[in-house]
Every structure is written in structure tokens, then in C-alpha cells.
Amino acid sequence: MNSKTSEKTEVVNGEILHTPDHLQRHLTPRQVQFVAIGGSIGTALFVSIGYGLMRGAASLLIAFVLHALVIAQVNNSLAEMTVFMPISAAFIHHASAWVDDAWGFMIGWNFFLFEALLIPFEITALDMVLTFWRDDIPSAAVITVCIVLYALCNALMVKYFGETEFWLAGGKLLLIGILFFFTFITMVGGNPQRDAYGFRNWSKPGPFVEYIDDGDLGRFHGFLAALWQAAFTIVGPEYLAIVAGEAQRPRTTMKAAFKSVYWRFGLFFIGGALCVGIVLPANDPTLLNVLSSGETGTGAASPFVIAMKNMNVEVLPHLVNALLLTSIYSAGNAYVYCSSRSLYGLALNGHAPKFLTKCTKQGVPIYCLFVALAFACLSFLKLGSGSVKVLTWLTNLITGGTLVTYIVICINYLFFYRALKAQSFDRSDLPYRGYFQPYGTWVALVWLMAVEIFYGYAIFLRGRWDIGIFFSNYTMGFLAICLFCSWKILKRTQFVRPEHADLVWIRPAVDEHEAAMAGNENEVGLRRRPAQLVRVDMKLSRASRSPRV
């Protein structure tokens, strides 16, 4: 976005090897899909969802449905922009190019920080889940092994990382399938007690559980607590935008991947919220002990594993816990990948030190990877403070950062939409056109800002003030404001005028990429022989700094 560059692109057997940002396009469509699954499904869905269940099964389900609809609209907006301009860390680049350079600086660092914080979160959760089998496993050893494995997986060529993540994410799909079948079979009587319990657990103590206060007000507080859990759990579109620059077929691959987000939300998140409320009551003693008092050594931080033990189901709890470990590891692996790529995007834009742009011959931003792994060392805090306390700190920080990211994506889209109109660009010519625009984005923006502001409201109620919880809830929001204002003042940046927003940018390069690949595949099909090396020299219009107000 800062200066014009030229790009040399290689197409070998239908694969684009080089991209404008010097990463390599090795990720196949199935790998892109599974990287997104790996990043969006992990501890939050299988373990932390228990916090929402404590507020009532109905509260949990309604909260998940409402928030999933909002994030689906965020996906709708992000898909339109990313398929149009498929570059690595897309929404970070979009923020700088279409809104304000200070806006891109802020969201880049916000996304990097909360993604990097997710790494120790997953490692700490993995260590806690291991206590299902033994309490005496040394946490320091578990943490060290995780960090080493993450380093090895991410230091390999991207195509091997993608294949690794494909199989790890496949384990998550298997786990979700097992949990769904377990729910249905046991609720109709297929359990050791032969008890067809149906939806009985919804009434224990009730579909909406009182929290903080009594009566209807208490039940409303309970719903809000479940909504905060939904805000932490339901994620996904941003991970697709991060890998857009490394997809083999940037337009066709990303379009299909973004469309798949909708059924993932419905099946995984809403389905998971429904199932957990069926198999376990909100007032289960083990659930309350683990999540309220912070006891570990039960496994059982996962509500599904607790339900299996309550029904005296043999073997299956061990299988589920083993798959849960691979699920948590997979999520952490994806977070190392995404945080290193977001930091790389910052360095390319001049928002981080230039040395971070160094890549290996295989296209891995090696110094960015080292920085991401340094954050993993925060998981050693668990040795002094305990798993549950550290998870709570990290959860609050991560949720705040996630909400900031989605707010930025919505504002990016509103500026993008305004630029299309100002430059008389017909939206019907876009490779992907979102629905209900721009009204859906406005609704999502208002909802997300309300959740961000009121996320920690409970500490302002009489007798509930806690300065530690206050800072963990609001640090990311305050930090975003400080980052934006400081960079804007320091660099004297200005908002991009809609008529001057760069809507050309990398489009010619991407169009030529796709044309080169299509031609290569046609040659293979017609001649029935291995494709020869095709080299396409093209100039990339990564326009010099756009005129600004």
C-alpha cells in the first residue's frame, strides 16, 4: 500500500507460488477450510462453554443464536472485501487503505495481541484437561513440549503446516460428531441407566438461571453472562482473511470458504450450545465445583465429559478427552500461525520493525514466528496462579480484543461501501456480494459496540467492584483507542476520502493469477501431460499512499 512494487509469480502444476507480500500460495481449498476450523473451534466450545451453561440452557442457546447471527453479518461484510482484495491479513490492510493508516496500525496490533494471548490460553487449558488422567503430570513439562511442537509445525513449509492443520482439524470434526451422536443416543434412552431423559435437564434448576439478583432481573443477568460467553466462543471469519494471501486460488477458494462459515456457525456453535444443555443440568455439582471454585484434576472441565461420567459411560470419556487434547492443540497451532502472519502484515505496512519482514526460503516469516512463540511462555504463569485464574484473565482480554476486531471490520466495510458509491463502482460486478448491505453491517456494529461497552458491567454493581477484573475486561478496548490516537497524532494521518480510496490495488495481479492458473489447467486437460513451468511477470499496482483528507 505504500509504494509500487513488481511481482514475479510462478505457476507450477496449477499452484501459484509467490504473492505480493512474499508469502507463498501453497494452501489448497480444503486446507484453507480446515485452518479456519482449527482456529475457530477449540477450548471455548468444548470446555469454557460450561460457564455459559451455568446461567441456564435456554439462556445459553438464545445467546449463541443471537450472537451467531451478528457474527454471520460480520462474515458477510468481510467476505465481500476479502474476495475483492485477497491479501494476507486482509482486514488489517483494508483498514489502512480504505479508512486511515492509524486505523490499520491499531487493528493490526490489536489482532496480533489477542491472537498471541490465545496461545498461552490453549496451552493452559490443555494442561488442565490432562489432569483427567493424572494430577501429578508436571505442568512445566507439558508447556515446554507444546511450545516446541508449535515451533516445529510452524517452521515447516506452509504446505506442510496446512496438511498438519488439516488432519488436526479433522479430529475436531470427529469429536463434534461423537458429541452430537452421544447427545441424541443418550437422550432417547441409549445410556447405562436406560433413561430417556430428553430435555429434562433444562428444568434443573430452570431454563433461565438467576445470577447476581433474584427474579426476572437475575435471569436477565444470567442471559447477559451467557451472551459474554458467546462473544468469546463464536469466532471464525477473521482466520479466513488472515490466510487469503496464501490460498492457491484466492478468489474462488476464499469465496467458497466464507460461504461455509454460515453452516459452521449453525452446526458447531449453535448445535454445541443445544447439546451441552441437553446432556448436563446447569446446577451439576461437578460443573459448579470446577468452574466456580477452580478445582482441577477432574477432566472434566468439559461439560460433555462430566455428563458421560454422570451416566457411568465407560471408555468414551477417555476417547473424548483424547480428542479434546488434539482439538486444543490444533487451535493453539492455528493461533501461532495467525499471530505470526498478522505481525508480518504489520511489518509490511511499516507498523512494526522492518526486520520482521524476513522470510525463510519456504515463505515462513521466521522472526514473527519467534515473537508469537514468546507469548506462549505466558502459560508458565499457571505454575504460580493456577489454571482457572490464568484462563479467566486471558478469556477477558481475548474477548475484548475479538470484539474490537469485529467492530473494525464493520467500519472497514462502511468505508469500503462508501468508496464504491463515490467511484460509481457497481456492486453487482464484485466477485462476491454480501446480503443486506449496508444495513446489516450497521446492525452488527451497534450490537458489537454495546457488547464491548457492557461486557464488564457487573463489576459496577454495588459490592462487586474488582480492579483486576475491570482491567482484564476493558484493557483491549482502552488499548485500541490509545493505539489509534497515538499513531494518528504521531504520524498526522488523515481519513481516506471515498473518491480517493484505492479500489485497484492488487486486483490486476490477482486477476492475472487466476487467468494463469486457468490457462495452465486447460493445457493439462487438453494435452494430458504434466504442466510445464509457466512464469508470469507482472507489475503490481500497490499504489503509492492514497490522497487523504
Regions found by a protein language model. Name each.
Residues 134, 170-315:
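Helix-loop-helix junctions that connect adjacent transmembrane segments
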Residues 91-93, 100, 210-213, 226, ...:
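TM-loop-TM module centered on a large, flexible mid-protein loop between adjacent transmembrane helices
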Residues 140-204, 235, 258-266, 395-408, ...:
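Membrane-interface loop-to-helix entry segments
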Residues 1-50, 54-58, 71-72, 76, ...:
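Membrane-interface "cap" regions at the ends of multi-pass membrane proteins
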Residues 87, 110-124, 229, 234-246, ...:
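Membrane-helix boundary/coupling elements in multi-pass transport proteins
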Residues 92-96, 122-143, 241-250, 259-263, ...:
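Helix-loop-helix connectors at the membrane interface of multi-pass transporters/channels
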Residues 358-363, 406-473, 497-503:
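C-terminal membrane-solvent junction of multi-pass transporters and transport-like membrane proteins
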